[in-house]
Design a protein with these regions (language model features):
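An N-terminal-biased, well-structured beta-alpha scaffold segment characteristic
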Residues: 2-110
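Glycine-rich phosphate/diphosphate-binding loop of Rossmann-like nucleotide-binding domains
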Residues: 6-45, 152-240, 287
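Glycine/serine-rich phosphate-binding loop and adjoining beta1-alpha1 elements at the start
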Residues: 2, 8, 77-169, 298-300
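Rossmann-like adenosine-cofactor binding region
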Residues: 209-291
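Adenosine-phosphate binding glycine-rich loop
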Residues: 118-144, 148-159, 269, 274-368
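Short glycine-/small-residue-rich Rossmann-like dinucleotide-binding loops
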Residues: 69, 75-76, 95-96, 221, ...
Length: 368
């Protein structure tokens, strides 16, 4: 199979879909890999690194899409890429379709086979290709939240951990999954007072056992969230319904309950956001203010630490990439039910129910 690795063109997206180690694995199995020039530069990989393991370098993104049977990326294609995607071409990347109707329609029209990292799901409901980036995003959510609490960044001027004699910042984390757990670990390590919420009591019991003593757990309900808002300094939104739009846990009306310059970090923005007032931002312009509340809603948070996040992501995706290349997408998905759940749009049909439901489109079960 011919595999193409284009350079990411989303704003400040510095990751790359495949490392030289991944290329070497595919070349060893007699596949051909084309990498766009400088695609890996911001993750620490030179063109020479790719050439040394057997990749061929192409100068332009158009060249990569034109020649490849399968495209391996990090983030969803953006508008300039839509016309480059061919009928029957496999595109293996994060898509987050439920948050973007135009993207969904474009991929339907393209006739491509769109396999979304974020909906590959194992029998135990774990999300093996979302987990590594959720770990990075959770840790970074606390890191950026702490920065935007600083006065020069528009925040309250509070230090997360305080100092002796001065109370630390209070952090509310909505969602106790991978993102929330990692955010809580970071916030606790910085010395903040942390409250983490979830609707799953079994999960809350687990978190109570494994997280530090300065992290408390709370059942997630509208009433409980409202009770916390007047006293918090930082809110991290990390709720997830796989493949579906995130629910709005904080409405615009609820912003009035918070003190001015409270910081909201919406990690769920990829799936539409869990705050009513959220809209996607970029690393170059990461925040905006609504009713006195600072919002951070960068849609590719891990892109700011490309070395760490590229390595973590490709460690997880490579076995699936190899299976797709060696077997073809139909056989690979037939052999692996987890991978089959990644099929979101296939040759003009919406094959993931949550995506179809969000947009009122026809859902068609894929036959393998």
């Amino acid at each position: 199979m011919i595999i193409g690795v284009p350079k990411e063109i989303k704003n400040n997206e510095n990751r790359v879909g495949m490392t030289p180690a991944g290329v070497a694995e595919l070349v060893k199995k007699s596949h051909t890999v084309y990498v766009q020039a400088t695609a890996g530069a911001n993750s620490g990989f030179s063109d020479d690194d790719y050439i040394a393991v057997g990749a061929q370098i192409l100068p332009a993104i158009e060249d990569v899409y034109a020649i490849a049977d399968m495209i391996v990326k990090v983030k969803e294609p953006i508008a300039p890429e839509y016309k480059l995607i061919k009928k029957g071409q496999v595109v293996f990347t994060y898509f987050h379709f439920a948050a973007d109707k135009l993207l969904t329609e474009a991929m339907i029209e393209s006739g491509a086979v769109c396999i979304a990292y974020e909906t590959v799901e194992k029998d135990d409901h774990s999300l093996p290709l979302l987990t590594p980036m959720s770990e990075v995003a959770g840790r970074m959510a606390t890191q950026v939240g702490a920065r935007f609490l600083e006065k020069p960044q528009g925040g309250k001027g509070k230090l997360m951990g305080g100092v002796p004699g001065v109370r630390p910042a209070r952090v509310l984390i909505l969602g106790g999954g991978v993102v929330g757990t990692n955010a809580a670990q970071m916030a606790a390590g910085m010395g903040a007072e942390v409250m983490i919420t979830d609707v799953n009591l079994t999960r809350l019991r687990y978190l109570s056992e494994v997280l530090p003593k300065n992290v408390k757990t709370l059942y997630s309900s509208l009433h409980n969230i409202k009770m916390e808002l007047p006293t918090v300094d930082l809110v991290i939104g990390s709720v997830l319904i796989p493949g579906d739009k995130a629910p709005h846990l904080i409405t615009r009306e609820m912003l009035k309950m918070m003190k001015p310059r409270t910081v909201l970090v919406d990690v769920a923005i990829d799936q539409g956001g869990c705050f009513e007032t959220s809209h996607p931002t970029t690393h170059s312009e990461p925040t905006y203010v609504v009713d006195g509340i600072v919002h951070y809603a960068v849609a590719n948070i891990p892109g700011a630490v490309p070395f760490t996040s590229t390595m973590a992501l490709t460690n997880a995706t490579l076995p699936y990439t190899v299976a797709l290349a060696c077997k073809g997408w139909k056989q690979a998905c037939k052999d692996d039910p987890a991978l089959a759940l990644g099929l979101n749009v296939v040759e003009g049909k919406v094959t993931y129910k949550a995506v179809a439901d969000v947009f009122g489109m026809r859902y068609e079960e894929i036959e393998l």
